[in-house]
C-alpha cells in the first residue's frame, strides 16, 4: 500500500491535484492539520475533478495523531534538505511518503528525528523546490515503479 501524507498543506489547488494523483494510482491520502483551506473548498474539489469517489482520505489533528495511528515504519520524508536521491530509497512494500507544507516544508524536528529517511528530488542549484503536487507525482510514480505498478494498467 502506498500512502501519501501531506503535512499542513496550504494551497487547495495542490491538494486537489494530489488527490487526483492518489485516485489514479490507488494511493491513500493522509492530511495532517492544520490545513490552509477547508477540505470542501471548491478549488480542492475542482482540481480533483470527478475522481473524489476514488480517493481514500483520512484527516489527522497533528503529526502525533498520524504516527499514533500509523506508526513510523517504512516512511520517507521528501525534503529539499534531504541528501538521499529519491531513486535510492527502497519504496517497496507498505510505504508512507511525507511531504511538508508549500511555504516551509517538513518541520525541522521531524527531519532531525529521521535523518536517514530524508529524500530529495534533484534540481539545479538556483531552484529552491518543485511545486508540491509535482513532487508528490514524481516520487509516487517512483514508488509505484519499484513495486511494479501494482493494480495499474497501461
Predicted regions and their residues:
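Post-transcriptional modification and biogenesis factors for structured RNAs
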Residues: 1-154
Amino acid at each position: 500500500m502506498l500512502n501519501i501524507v501531506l503535512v499542513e498543506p496550504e494551497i487547495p489547488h495542490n491538494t486537489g491535484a494530489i488527490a487526483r494523483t492518489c485516485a489514479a494510482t490507488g494511493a491513500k491520502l493522509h492530511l495532517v492539520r492544520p490545513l490552509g483551506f477547508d477540505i470542501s473548498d471548491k478549488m480542492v474539489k475542482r482540481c480533483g475533478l470527478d475522481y473524489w469517489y476514488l480517493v481514500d482520505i483520512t484527516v489527522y489533528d497533528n503529526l502525533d495523531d498520524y504516527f499514533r495511528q500509523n506508526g513510523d515504519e517504512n516512511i520517507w520524508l521528501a525534503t529539499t534538505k534531504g541528501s538521499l536521491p529519491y531513486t535510492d530509497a527502497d519504496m517497496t512494500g507498505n510505504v508512507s511518503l511525507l511531504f511538508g507544507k508549500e511555504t516551509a516544508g517538513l518541520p525541522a524536528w521531524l527531519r532531525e528525528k529521521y535523518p536517514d529517511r530524508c529524500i530529495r528530488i534533484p534540481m539545479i542549484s538556483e531552484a529552491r523546490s518543485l511545486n508540491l503536487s509535482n513532487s508528490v507525482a514524481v516520487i509516487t510514480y517512483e514508488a509505484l515503479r519499484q513495486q511494479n505498478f501494482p493494480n495499474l494498467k497501461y
